[in-house]
Every structure is written in C-alpha cells, then in structure tokens.
Amino acid sequence: MASLFERPSLVFGAAIVLRAILLVYGAWQDAHSAVKYTDIDYMVFTDAARYVSKGDSPYARDTYRYTPLLAWLLLPTSWDGFFSFGKVLFALSDVVAGWLIAKALTSFYGMSPPRALKYASVWLLNPMVANISTRGSSEGLLCVLVIALLWAVLNRKITLAGVLLGLSVHFKIYPFVYGPSIIWWLDEEREGLKSSSQKQKPEQDDRNLLTHIFNFITPSRLLLTTTALATFSGLNISMYILYDFPFAQHTYLHHLTRIDHRHNFSPYSSLLYLSAAGDIQGSFESLAFIPQLLLSVVVIPIVLAKRSLPGAMLAQTFAFVTFNKVCTSQYFLWYLIFLPFYLPSSSLMKNPRLGITVTALWVIAQALWLQQGYYLEFLGLSSFVPGLFLASLGFFAVNIWILGIIINDVALEGC
C-alpha cells in the first residue's frame, strides 16, 4: 500500500478510473432503470444551458437557482452527443481538487509527497465524492475553488485569494463564512509587521483601543477584503445587467426563504413540509439562520482560526451544513474536502476506535434517514412524522457530537 502512494500516477489514475466506471454505469442505469442515476439538478443545469444556447436566459428554466456562469460552462451539453460533458467536467474537478490538496499538504504542512497523497486519497478515492460528481452535481467545481482559496491564503498569495473568495461566493453563497476566519488568521505576526517597540508595550496597547483597531487593519487584510468585494460585486453587476432581477431573485434572494422538504436531512424538514402545505405560520425559515451564522461566522472563526485555518474552515462548514435548514448529500462534500488537513493530527486517527465509531454512526444515521425516505418516495407511505422527523433528529445529534470532536481537536491540537 505504501508503494501506491509513492506513485502519484497510480493514485490519480485510480481516481479517474473510478469516476469513469461510475459514468458508464450511470448511463446504463439511466437507460434501463426507473430509478435514474443522474441527479435531477443536472437536468436543470443542462436545460438552462440549452436556453442560453438559444439566446435566452437560464432562468427561463424553472428551479434554476444558480449563477449564469454554471449554465455558460455547460453550453457544450446542448450539442449532440455531449449531454454528459458536465458530469465529466465535475468529475475531473474532483481530481483537480485532490491534486490541490496534496500540493497544499506538501507546501505548507511540510508532508512528504507520499504521506500527502495518502491523505489526499481520502478525497480522491472516496466513493461518495465520485458518486455525487458523476451523478451531475456541480459541487466538484466549488470544491476546486475553495481548496484553491485555502492554498492561496496559506501561500500568501493574497490577491489571488481575494479573487477566489469573491468568485466562490458568487458561485454559491456559503463560502462567505470563510472570510472572517481568513481575515482573523492574517494577523501581524504572520505578516512580520509588528515592530519590536509594539511588542514591548502590551500594557499601553491594551489601554488604547484605537491602536488595536489600526493594528488590525493590515495591508493583507485590506487587500483580501477589497479584492474579494471587487470580484464579487463585478460579477454580480455584470450578471444583473445581463439578466436583470431574475438573477438576483433566483441566485440569492430565493435562498433566504427557501422551503425544500424533499431529500432534506435537516430536522427542519418536517417544519418545511408543514409550512409548504400551509399548516403552520411563521418566519422560522429566516430565524433558522441565527444559530447557523452565529456559530459559523462568529464563534468558530474567533476561537479556532488562529489555531488552524483549515481546521477552522472544516468546523465552520460542518456547523453551517449541520444547522442549515436544507441539508442534502451534496452538501457533505463541502466539509469532506477539508478532511485531509484535519485527519493527520486528529483524535480520530490517534484513537482508531473513536474514528471507527464516528464513521459508523455517521453512516448508520444517514441509512436510517434514507430508509424513511424510501418509504416516502418509492412506496408512497407518509413517513414525515414520526419516521423522517426522528431520523433527522438522530442524524442532527450525531453531527453535533462530531462537530464537538472537531472543535476540541482544532482548539487543543491545531488540527
């Protein structure tokens, strides 16, 4: 096994072959089974691309809730014989993300290439990751942007990091949570800007709030913030000019009051179902953001970012997904991408029994939910209450426990 990781061509070749097999199998299942392999979102993407190819708006396709950039990227799917172009693009994006992970582990963490590749394989050879991308989920593209962002920050390429952060948030809203962690991580000591005179007078600095404020505003923080805002604003203004209010409505505003109770692991799913049916009244869809954002945008960055930026980003993402009012399997990729950075020093590796228990409970909790989902989707049985609701609570409880382990590891070990 050790020799495998000493030969990158074998690992990346295996990752590509795994995805190629799933692509071929997916085409066969789509043609021969009532249960389709291709994700319904991919049909939405390709329909939107077809509208764009005809000179129309991608938002002419109902339920297209994404940036027009995605429809533009998938324009080849409107050509004869190129329907699976997007799936191939997403699958290759997975592999590129894995390459960036290995590169970051060697350049910043000083790992040997074989050891870095071993941990990168947690992503590259993960069947869940390969399955989701080959079904037509675009998360692989986003994961490339996020890991490229992390690599750029760790290697002090601040302008590039700002561009990638702005592009990532434009592509999908949630990466904005990384902004506070990155800014907090970029302190004076890392930039080498704090003078010896400043270091010799901590008591004086503590009494001077204005000094702290000025010390916080460093060149790197300013550059990152302005570059990210300029990129995000430039893209949004351009898209608004092209597609007017439907762009803002479907890409951003829709998600503030989104009601989606199908394929939703969140404990909010039953409430969303009742809300969609008109059985309950209230604004809980918006209130659900409070614990989610408090944890992922405020508490975790302040507590963890200076200990470990990748660890803080993992904890932020895990908290964001766990507390999100909509939680689907695709969202798991958002935090799985950070596992190669967290695992080497984690308690899950130091205590294999704990690692196996965490993995088993995470999988079992999903399986119990999927069983109830099968009763609902395929057998037509009403399983929202108590089946799906209890399964969602169980999965939520498991994730809260895992989040506690991650936060503790990062705080104590700097994972």
UniProtKB/Swiss-Prot annotation:
What EC number(s) is this enzyme filed under? 2.4.1.-
Q: Which InterPro entries match?
A: PIG-M
- What keyword terms does UniProt attach to this protein? Cell wall biogenesis/degradation, Endoplasmic reticulum, Glycosyltransferase, GPI-anchor biosynthesis, Membrane, Transferase, Transmembrane, Transmembrane helix
Q: Which GO terms describe its cellular component?
A: endoplasmic reticulum membrane; glycosylphosphatidylinositol-mannosyltransferase I complex
Q: Pfam families attached here?
A: Mannosyl_trans (PF05007)
Query: Could you tell me which pathway this protein works in?
Result: Glycolipid biosynthesis; glycosylphosphatidylinositol-anchor biosynthesis
Q: Does the keyword Cell wall biogenesis/degradation apply?
A: yes
* Main localization (coarse): endoplasmic reticulum
UniProt topology in membrane: Multi-pass membrane protein
Q: GO biological process: what's one of them?
A: cell wall organization
Q: What does the UniProt entry say about where the protein is found?
A: Endoplasmic reticulum membrane
Q: Name one GO molecular function term.
A: alpha-1,4-mannosyltransferase activity
Relate the protein's function as given in its record.
Mannosyltransferase involved in glycosylphosphatidylinositol-anchor biosynthesis. Transfers the first alpha-1,4-mannose to GlcN-acyl-PI during GPI precursor assembly. Required for cell wall integrity.
PANTHER family to which the protein is assigned, alphabetical: GPI MANNOSYLTRANSFERASE 1 (PTHR12886:SF0), PIG-M MANNOSYLTRANSFERASE (PTHR12886)
Q: Which family does it belong to?
A: Belongs to the PIGM family.
- Which protein is depicted? GPI mannosyltransferase 1
> Taxonomic lineage per UniProt?
Eukaryota, Fungi, Dikarya, Ascomycota, Pezizomycotina
